[in-house]
Amino acid sequence: MIKSELVQIIATRNPHLFLRDVENIVGAIFDEITDALAEGNRVELRGFGAFSVKNRPARTGRNPRTGESVEVEEKWVPFFKTGKELRERLNGGK
């Protein structure tokens, strides 16, 4: 599912909302999650999961084509840990 499909599903299930309003709401949610992660904060959605950022330290990598050693810089990467209810639902629990 892509963002536009999510917007369409929410709009269909909530006919009292205008499509434009649903687009704005979904966009605002993603913007807030992104902003929180960019500030180094954790975003927890109970039952669904938690978004956070993890540090990947600098390391020496290898170019797979040439075999040459390459220095890979330190970076921050997004991380998602599923919540208990989501894991249970995915595994046929509910």
UniProtKB/Swiss-Prot annotation:
InterPro entries: Hist_DNA-bd, Histone-like_DNA-bd_CS, IHF-like_DNA-bd_dom_sf, IHF_beta. GO terms for biological process: DNA recombination; regulation of DNA-templated transcription; regulation of translation. It holds the Pfam family Bac_DNA_binding. Belongs to the bacterial histone-like protein family. The lineage of its organism: Bacteria, Pseudomonadati, Pseudomonadota, Alphaproteobacteria, Hyphomicrobiales. Keywords: DNA recombination, DNA-binding, Transcription, Transcription regulation, Translation regulation. The keyword Chaperone does not apply. This protein is one of the two subunits of integration host factor, a specific DNA-binding protein that functions in genetic recombination as well as in transcriptional and translational control. The gene is ihfB. One of its GO terms (cellular component) is chromosome. This is Integration host factor subunit beta. NCBIfam families: hip, PRK00199.1. Heterodimer of an alpha and a beta chain. One of its GO terms (molecular function) is structural constituent of chromatin. The keyword Secreted does not apply.
